[in-house]
Amino acid sequence: MAKTNIATVAPAEQELFNKQEAFFLKFRKQILIAVAALIIVVGGWAAYSNLIAGPREEKASTALAKAQEMFGQGEFQKALNGDKTTEGFLAVAENYGGTDAANLARAYAGLCYANMAKWKEAVTYLEDFSAREDMMISPAVTGALANAYANTGDIDKAISTFKKAADMADSKAEDEVNNSLSPSYLISAARLLESQNKKSEALEIYKEVKEKYVNSASSQDIDKYIERVSE
């Protein structure tokens, strides 16, 4: 998850945006006059959506993509804060509030902090991410948040959040079974329960993983976990 790009801008889309931006700059006065008239007629929402929100989202996505490249190269500090030519995730989150790119930037900022072992900061930004109704990204960010909770010593919250991440992943999966994400989150929750000497609760989770996620790589070693907490 940590090194997967969760938003990219296709070259064709970027070229189209560049052309639209150039057109807007050339005919700014005429367009703004027309926009003013449109605001009077329809209350401004269509104008905002088409001429401001759209290009703003494109700009935010472009800035995000550049920071993602740094993230993918393991340059977490630079991805977070940017450099002379690139806005980092913190700037994207701050400057493009309300866009999908800003939301993803908050998740990435949290992941950067996590990779730098700055767990309290990681919690702050991962909590600020607004989950969507998807099968992979939102559950993965929630799982990262659970890991951050564990590393700040909030074990109970980590356990419940790992379970939540698994539920989120399953809810959008075919047959409500996400073999890619859910088993690892549940196993993480169970191992934390073991650390609290709650073996019976951990056992129930391990049994669930064995029975429900039979096609998952994570379930291949599940018998040794079951044996350990059954002793």
Question: Where does each model-flagged region fall?
Answer:
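Short solvent-exposed coil/turn linkers within tandem alpha-helical repeat scaffolds
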Residues: G54, A93-A102, M116, A131-S138, ...
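N-terminal positive-inside, membrane-proximal cytosolic segments immediately preceding the first
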Residues: M1-A37
